Amino acid sequence: MEQDFSMHANPLVAKLQKPASEFTKADIVSYIKENGITMVNFMYPAADGRLKTLNFVINDAAYLDAILTCGERVDGSSLFPFIEAGSSDLYVIPRFCTAFIDPFAEQPTLSMLCSFFNKDGEPLESSPEHTLRKACRAFTEVTGMEFQAMGELEYYVISEDSGMFPATDQRGYHESAPYAKFNEFRTECMAYIAQAGGQIKYGHSEVGNFTLDGKIYEQNEIEFLPVRAEQAADQLMIAKWIIRNLAYQYGYDITFAPKITAGKAGSGLHIHMRIMKDGKNQMLKDGVLSETARKAIAGMMELAPSITAFGNTNPTSYFRLVPHQEAPTNICWGDRNRSVLVRVPLGWSAKTDMCMIANPLEAPSNYDTTQKQTVEMRSPDGSADLYQLIAGLAVACRCGFEMPDALEIADKTYVNVNIHKKENEDKLKQLAQLPDSCVASADCLEKQRAAFEKYNVFSPAMIDGIISKLRAYEDRTLRSEVQDSPEEMLKLVEKYFHCGQRTEQIL
């Protein structure tokens, strides 16, 4: 059956009538010619977590072909601090499947994400994007299956408080206007992200909602659909860029920071995963969680301490990961349980046709709901290195298939109660805890680095660089030192307010 792309949000997909994964150079050239595109942007993440941009004016057809084919040189030492200036040249080559129209450019502009290559024309081994590609390849080689992921992107919008229709403090979940003030901003972000190729599930206001010093702080979330893991990281990267740019146009401030004030909800970056084979979701069997899913979970239980090195990368991360909040602190998993590290959310496994019940005029749908089941890692936050985090999760899930006692570990770490309630103290004492600082996270990565370096997924130099950066924070006792000092906490929040993907490492 021929696929209909006419309603696709990405105008390139709608025009070319093919999925972005099938875009060729000829497609890009054709679209540029037929749609009056005058500029091309190459974009790529650097060490500070922000997308960098290289602008090209389309001089003529020959020049367009040259830049699409050959890419361009960039100074790697200015992008990644651990590349030596004496041998710093890198190539950036556009990936056609990431092409989108820049919604903020005054000139008609087509943008693409790029891959880094070294002087020998080989993929840069320690580039975040290539590391994720290697992690996914190793997962498939070991399991014969495909690793997919998607993110829940939480952020705060900050603006002047009008005082009208005040929302209830810390009760902003799924709130509507006029109590939620930034619904229109969020939906405009969603439209731009979708036009740039992001596969969005939905958006909504989140729990966090408060006023401070005449400003309103409103937490929002945009959640994506599961896609290939490489695409999942790309769309999160572009989404953060779009949200920040649109906020700038509106005069708002935006933060993805894990914690912005004591006693208020912090922002996480929960990552959902599913495992596919021949286009079918392998997370369920006969309506219950499959052995495949439980092995993947066991791998995450095993490597959870070191995954924080990729997903919780600055000191304020560990002010979010505290007991008795929705953010996890213990290494365990469970069904529909928000006190656990890995949660198995509702997966439409009930044997009823809810659509027909709600809409009696509808015929039975026979919709395959098994495709919807995921598992969710709840520890990461907005400081995460997006590519390294998802690569680390792919490694952890792969390890679950290599561990002979994986199913035993899954059984041992399963909980079906709120572990923070007093009556469950004994169960809580049996569970290992996540690191409580960047330094502790670095120690865990040092101990478990072999799993990440296996199959040459993470290079030893990359792991060394991550460990060095985390230890440089010297925050082993910071949480206890500042917990009773609002002034010191505020200084930390301000320092890491614009945190993002961190890729500072030895390359």
Kindly give the residue locations of the regions a language model identified:
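Glycine-rich, acidic/polar active-site loops that bind/position phosphate-bearing ligands
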Residues: 2-507
